[in-house]
Amino acid sequence: MRAGRFAVAGLVAMLALVGTGSTGRGAEDRVQFRDPLTDEPLEIDLPPDATEAVRRFHETGENPYQGDEAAIANGRELYNRWCASCHMPDGSGRLGPSLIDDTWQYERTDTPLGQFEIIYAGGTGAMQPFGQRMSQDEILKVIAYTDHLRQQQQ
């Protein structure tokens, strides 16, 4: 009888672990951030005050703000403050590369995930890390804005 209880408890625990992995909510199912220069794993923790958009981004790697007009407007303000001096107000590039063409310096930066990684962690040359200057939510809004700029050019 006692052995049966342990077997059932073990089975329940095992099913709980397997269930966690299949729902997409376990830590192992979260996005694996990578350094844009070295492709090494990059630790980007989910902040305790994360917005729903940041939580979804950490789960999927997709930007929930893409196409969101309010987020794009806020992203434009942030872009003009932090990014326009190197990438130009229209995104055409100066010190930094163009953000409105289809040429990417790093393989991963053609995705919202790769763009987030390079803004957060930095790149080569003048591209400094912005992970301590902007919140993760703000970075997602900047990406929504640059995606909007790119779509306008096509």
For the regions a language model picked out, list residue spans one by one.
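Sequence/structural segment immediately N-terminal to covalent heme-attachment motifs in c-type
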Residues: E52-R55, D68-D90, Q105, L113-A121
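Inter-heme linker and motif-flanking segments adjacent to c-type heme-binding CXXCH motifs
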Residues: S92, H148-Q154
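Periplasmic c-type cytochrome electron-transfer domains
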Residues: G21-N74, T109-D110, G131-H148
